[in-house]
Amino acid sequence: YHAIAYFSKLETPPTAFYCANDILAIGMLKYLAQSKNWYYHPSIISSDNIVESQYTTPMLTTVSLPKAEMAHLAIQILTDRMNGGHKAIVKTELQSTLIIRQSVRQYISTENEPEYYI
């Protein structure tokens, strides 16, 4: 909530945000809904796909993560390490799903806009 308040007041605010989780993104959407700046509508995307993300305005675009599989692998690796195995870093790739809703819009470039890396 406070981050978007700060960024929205910049002379050239970011056009998009990726939030670590849906709760943070919902806070950003809440700020934008309550804001007096009717012309600032950045794209917002996050990770989790919690139920509440379907009921925001606009509905939140999110990445659905395989939470059960992530938990199973974490427990398996932890158990192996406790038993003396898995001493090296473990790299695992899991399938995720992008749930496209209404919080992301097409980007239209303008002249002289700065690049942001947040």
Describe these PLM feature segments.
Residues 1, 5-117:
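Flexible loop/turn connectors
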